[in-house]
Amino acid sequence: MSFLFSFLRLSSVLAVLLASVFFAPATWARDIPVFVAPKDRLAGPAEAAWPHNQFVTLSYHDVNDTVADQRYVAVRTDNLIEQFNWLRENGYQPVSIAQILAARQGGPALPPKATLLTFDDGFSSFFHRVLPVLRTFQWPAVLAPVGTWVDTPQGQEVDFGGLSTPREQIATWAQIKAIADSGLVEIGAHTQNMHYGVQANPQGSMQPVAVTRI
C-alpha cells in the first residue's frame, strides 16, 4: 500500500514537471515583447522635435567656490562650467530676452533647444565668476538683482530675506554697469524690495510677499 502511495505521489510530481516543460515555453512566448525596428518606434521626449519658438529657462543664483551655501542656492564654478559644457554638447542654444521677444513679435524664430540663462538676486559672484565663463562660451544671460540689496551701503549687512549677508556678497551698481556693458548680459529686476516672506494665512504659512500683497 505504501509502495502504491509512493508511486502515485511520484507520478503526480512527474506530471507537474512535464506540464511545466510543455506549457512554460508558451507562457514565456507571451511575455516576450514584439520587436519593433528603430525607424518604427515612437520618439521619446529627448528625440521629439523641439516646439516652434519655445524655450526652457535655467535659473541660477550664487556661484561660490568656498562653500556652495544652499541658503543662497549656490553652485561651484567648476559645476557651472560642467553644466554649460553639457548644454553645448547636447545642442542647447542660449538666447536673450530680446531674441525671445522678437520671435514672439514675428521676427526671427528661436533656434531649436533655445535656453534662457538667468541669475537671480544680484550676487557679486556674477561679476567675478559668471561673466568670464559667459565670455568664454559667448553666451547671453540675464542678471536680475534685488534693488534694495544693491542699494545697501558698503560696510552694512544685507537683509537677504531675513538672512544677514555680508555686503560684498551682493554686486555694486558699478559692477552691474560693467556687466551690462559686456554686451552679453541683459539686466532685469528681481523686485525692488519684495524678495522676502510674509505670513500668508491664519495658519502661519510663509509665502513670497510679491504674491501675497499684490
Which residues make up each language-model segment?
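Substrate-binding cleft of extracellular glycoside hydrolase catalytic domains
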Residues: T118-S124, W139
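Alpha-helical scaffolding within the catalytic cores
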Residues: K39-A46, I100-R104, F127-V130, L163-A180, ...
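Bacterial N-terminal signal peptides
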Residues: S11-F22
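Aromatic- and glycine-enriched glycan-recognition loops and surfaces
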Residues: V73-R88, G122-S124, P166-A174
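Bacterial N-terminal signal peptides that target proteins for export
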Residues: S2-V13
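C-terminal domain-boundary segment and adjacent tail
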Residues: V75-A109
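Metal-dependent polysaccharide deacetylase catalytic core of the NodB/CE4 family, i.e.
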Residues: L58-T66, Q70, K113-T115, R135-I214
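Boundary at the C-terminal end of the N-terminal hydrophobic targeting segment
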Residues: T27-A29
